[in-house]
Amino acid sequence: MTTKNMNTPPGSTQENEIDLLRLVGELWDHRKFIISVTALFTLIAVAYSLLSTPIYQADTLVQVEQKQGNAILSGLSDMIPNSSPESAPEIQLLQSRMILGKTIAELNLRDIVEQKYFPIVGRGWARLTKEKPGELAISWMHIPQLNGQDQQLTLTVGENGHYTLEGEEFTVNGMVGQRLEKDGVALTIADIKAKPGTQFVLSQRTELEAINALQETFTVSERSKESGMLELTMTGDDPQLITRILNSIANNYLQQNIARQAAQDSQSLEFLQRQLPEVRSELDQAEEKLNVYRQQRDSVDLNLEAKAVLEQIVNVDNQLNELTFREAEISQLYKKDHPTYRALLEKRQTLEQERKRLNKRVSAMPSTQQEVLRLSRDVEAGRAVYLQLLNRQQELSISKSSAIGNVRIIDPAVTQPQPVKPKKALNVVLGFILGLFISVGAVLARAMLRRGVEAPEQLEEHGISVYATIPMSEWLDKRTRLRKKNLFSNQQRHRTKNIPFLAVDNPADSAVEAVRALRTSLHFAMMETENNILMITGATPDSGKTFVSSTLAAVIAQSDQKVLFIDADLRRGYSHNLFTVSNEHGLSEYLAGKDELNKVIQHFGKGGFDVITRGQVPPNPSELLMRDRMRQLLEWANDHYDLVIVDTPPMLAVSDAAVVGRSVGTSLLVARFGLNTAKEVSLSMQRLEQAGVNIKGAILNGVIKRASTAYSYGYNYYGYSYSEKE
């Protein structure tokens, strides 16, 4: 036994160190479990990496240049700063249904043709074995919905170009190159490259479903900020198909950009063609008015000052007219809060102020000069506008016929030769880490949740004396265990029939050696007791009380003492199976008055002691144990035997042990390593003491040699046997 100094304050540093060592020991104790789980997860990751379908990535590069506008906007560069190309709207345009819809129509992406493989692993296995996949070329396919749902058809390849098409409500045979129609389904197969018996699953999705599926694998990003370089990427399991899709998207985007530019030029050209006749008519009218006025005034000419003012006014009017045309174009592209539009409005305001200033100078001139100046201004301004519009018309005609847009394809689509998924090395590493994390976490969680007693100190902290620690007998455990332990349970079930008797069949076992040490401790503990009767009980079922009491009876009998073993567990006692003796006449028959002592006492020859088995299970075991015949039996046995060992039921299950314990001199409580908690043992001892039972202490049974226990408490139980040599 060990003692504990209650006045010593706990050292938190030492306790933390012990807890850490205990956790390390737990990991070492369960190293096989950790290795197995980690290996399992690693193998799963390897299998996933090998069997999963490789995903490839294709990319193309498109440049969006700064919008130059049409000829009407060609003069804006002098009043607004250069701006970077706006990539965000172009990215949205590339991902729009307008662009993707054209690609889906061009490549027939609504049609889905998939070869049928064994579920989950079939495709990966075919790829690993380098089995060439089948190919099915479809010229035309139409699959209507059935009951509002998309339907799938199964095509089975036959011999010599024949095939069988199966739907939910039909089965029909077809031939390559011939149109097949059945229940609204129309199909024309152009070519089949597959072995007979190969199956394909055919389905057809809506255009919107195809667009949504394409958007999930298609991404657009700007390579660097405000660079105008757009990188288009697409992922998929068919390298050739994703290359064709990307090229189609890029070309469709380019064509719509050119068409849009041409449409803008065409719209501007139409605007100019409407304006030219009106401007020409206004010019003719202005010239006629000027000529008429001069004839009336005898060819009045302008002085130098008036000519200078006229030139300035005409210049301002020309600029204002040019801004009018520019605004007509800009209003189609930008809102008024756009920097380009704001710059135009500011320029117009400046010119308007300049024109007002010039008009004030004109108003100070003689009336004749004012009128001539006004008419001349109208003629010069009209002539400038007309010539400008003619030039613009020619420029727009050329621009419309040679429109190239502001987009160009820099790099055509290319698929990278190596798949981007799965990342095999990363998957294996993650599988290893995940398996290690889960296994270690499970072991540590189990260690933190486990509350069973694993060392005598845990009982002694509650004031309970520990008379012996009996190690687990691996020899006996292998022969009697009914089920294997699991990680989160210490409870083990053992056979109660056809079991060996350890003290006789393997007397050199370490558990038997521990019981011999218990025999020595009991010799001194029972010297001052009122009788030589020893009761052994347990806290809960499966604590091992019968094993301890029967083995103790055998080792004491081996020291030439006369021993009587009484099985007082009238409910579940199984000593008759352990000793291979009859159970027809036992303790229950004696207590009920059916048999006398000479009929219920049997001699167990192999063990060298006498036995009273439990007998037949009575309906009232507690009441039988409370009868005087039980007390009389114990008194008689005390007089005729050197030691009487009474095996009683678990204390927390029934009260039988408290009934029997009042008549015995010494009592011991068996606690199972890892199964019983210190609270259960303490509560059992308390109930026995309240019943007036002289309880000496406890026995820690089934101790397993663990690294965690050794690190925490420094125990190394009974490693010596007769076969060991020094």
Swiss-Prot record:
Instruction: Note the superkingdom of the native organism.
Output: Bacteria
| Catalytic activity reported | L-tyrosyl-[protein] + ATP = O-phospho-L-tyrosyl-[protein] + ADP + H(+)
Recorded hits in Pfam families, A to Z, give: AAA_31, GNVR, WZC_N, Wzz
Q: What is this protein called?
A: Tyrosine-protein kinase etk
Transmembrane spans: 33-53, 425-445
Enzyme Commission designation:
2.7.10.-
What PTM annotation applies here?
Autophosphorylated. Dephosphorylated by etp.
Bilayer topology reads: Multi-pass membrane protein
Q: Which residues lie on this side of the membrane: Cytoplasmic?
A: 1-32, 446-726
Q: Which gene encodes it?
A: etk
